[in-house]
Amino acid sequence: MVLAAVAGVGLTLAGSPGASARVATRTATVTKPCGGEALAPKPGGGAWACTFDDEFSGTTLNRSWWVPQVTATSAFTTGPIGSEACYVDSPSNISVSGGALHLTARKEASPFTCSWFTTQYTAGMVSTYTGFNQTYGRFEVRALLPQTTVAGLQETLWLWPVNDTLYGPWPGSGEVDFSEFYSLYSYLDIPYIHYNYSSTTVNAATHTNTVTAYNCQIALSQYSAYAVVWTPGSFTITINGKTCLIDNYVPNGGLTSPAPFNQPFFIALTQALGIGANAFNPATTPLPATTSVDYVRVWK
């Protein structure tokens, strides 16, 4: 989850879900095709099979699949020092209604102590840390982003490795931010794929180690479908079916593709407060701010 797009500063998950996590492979019980969505054949041929599908059609979070992120037990936070977001398991921050999951950042009535810091801000995040993970496949999330063009808000739809120290400290084991929104650049989605590589190997013509893109335009007022197709050695990210980024990854540090992306990853959905050029400003950034998720679908 990149919190400063220009600087490329990354933030890892800590605790549960988080650093040095060890989770057995989890599969979801899917009783219908993924939303009835028809897909083109898989790269290399064959048909996609639905492995996970949450349409958020009820009124409560399916906790057999999703676990809320809680700062008190994980130390995970976003936002600038002095205005950090405390992630809490509260219906004010995480709710399901109207056919969507809603993740909200908000200002509380008064300051409170959250883990090691004092803040007045809370936010919502969920992941399939204990409910579902998969190696390779197609992951798609349809989401509506916060409706603001003022700096300070961030949304991330991402994949995180089950064993996040398998290939050393972050970003050695990889991270896939297949959708990343900064409200300062409200017309763009800026995906980012994290791993160790040599900058001398980047080749736009062959899509070698092209880890990010700055030309993926979005319509802020509409739901968009953000998808990533992950195969051994490559990622293809699309927005509403239009290709946004292709990365044929070639890691360094003694690794050979498909490492480090050759283990299960789980899904994380985050409403965040920004830092850096997109820093949250209590005086100007509008709150509450919500990312609404229409569905999460996965195929293999």
Indicate where each model-derived feature is located:
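Secretory targeting and sorting signals
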Residues: 1-22
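Proteolytic processing junctions in secreted/extracellular precursors
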Residues: 22, 26-28
